[in-house]
Amino acid sequence: MAQITNFFLGANSGSGFQNLFSEIMDPETAFDIMILKGGPGVGKNTFMREIGRTMEQAGADVEYLWCSGDPDSLDGVVIPMLRCAVCDGTSPHAVEPKYPAAVDRYVDLGRFYDLPAAKAQAVEVKRHTHDYQDAYGRAYHCLKAARQVELDTVAEVSRSFDCQRAARRFSGIMARELRGRGSGTGKITRRFLGSLTHRGPVWRFDSVEALCPKVYELEDSYEQAGPLLAALCGEATRRDYDVTACPSTEEPGRLEHLLIPELGVAFVTSKPGMVYPGKPYRRVRLDALSHPENKARLRFRARMTGVLREEGIAALQEAKAAHDLLEGVYNPYVDFEGVRAQAALEAGRLLSWMK
C-alpha cells in the first residue's frame, strides 16, 4: 500500500514568505522535475492532484506539499521511488530549471487560458490582484510585530535556561536511539511541517506518525530545542541515517522537528499554537528547565503576540478571499479538459518509468 505524507515548502512568517521550493528535490540526483508555469486559476492544483492520484493508484509512495496561502491546494508532489517531482513554479516560489530538459523542465499551463477572453477581464484581474497583494502586506506587518514581541520573550527565557541539564538529557536519548549505522547516505530533506494560514496554524503531524511510530514530544514554548535537535541531526546523518528536518517557519535555520524514518523515531516540538495531538513515547519538558523572573510580563507578551497573530490571520483571510475572486475571474476562460489531458499525459510518462 502506498505511503502518503504531507508537508509544506512555503510558510507565512514575521519575515514574510519563507521558501524551501529550491529543495523540493536535489537536481543532482533527480530524474525528472516538472515546473508548472501559468497564472491564477489555470489548474496547477488540478494537474498535481491528477499526478498524485495516478501514482497512488499505481502503488507508489507520494509526498504532497501543500500551499500556505490555501492549505487545501497543492504546491508540489514528490514521487521518491522515481526520483520525480512536480511543483508550482510561479511567484512567489520562483523555481527555475538548473539542467533544462535533462533533469528539470517547464510545463506551460498558461496555454490553456482563453487569451482574448482573459484580456477582456483586465480591469477585474488587476483589482483583485492588488487587493490580495495589499492583504498579504498587512498580514506580514502584523506577523512581524508579533514576532518582535515573541523574540523579546525568547531572549528573556534563554537567560535562565539550564543548557547543560538539557544537553545531558539529550545525550542519553542520543545514546539510546542512535546505535549502529543506517542504510542511507546521511541525506537531509528539509520540509516545513506546517504554516500559519488563513485557517490559523495548520500542522501535519499525521506525516510524523506515518513515518515514525516512536515520537519524543519536546515541550518547548520558548525556542530552546534548536541546538539540541541540530546535535541529534548531526549524529544521525554521521551514522548514515537519512532524515527529514523540519525547520521553524519563523527561522528556517533553526530545527523544530526531526524525523528518522529508518529508525521509526521522531522528535517534535510542542508549544502553544503547535500542539502535538498524539500520545508520545516520551515527553521531554524543556520548559521546566528555565526559570524566568517576571512571569506576569511573559504572560502579557504572550497575549500581545496572540492578538497580533490573530490580526495577521484576519489579513490572510482577506488575501484568500481576494485570490478566490481572482481565480473566479479566470476559471470560465480555462480549458480544464486540456489541463487534465496534459496531466494524464505526464502521469502516463511517470507510469512508464515504473516499469
Residue positions per predicted region:
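A cross-family "folded-core" feature that marks the main globular domain of proteins
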Residues: 36-37, 47, 55, 63-66, ...
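An accessory alpha-helical subdomain
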Residues: 124-177, 297-300, 304-343
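Rhodanese-like catalytic fold shared by cysteine-dependent sulfurtransferases
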Residues: 73, 89, 173-180, 184, ...
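Conserved nucleotide-sensing/catalytic segment adjacent to the nucleotide-binding pocket
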Residues: 2-18, 32, 53-117, 124, ...
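Glycine-rich phosphate-binding P-loop
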Residues: 33-52, 199-236
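N-terminal pre-Walker A segment at the start of P-loop NTPase domains
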Residues: 1-25, 164, 171-207
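GST-like fold's C-terminal all-alpha helical module
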Residues: 348-355
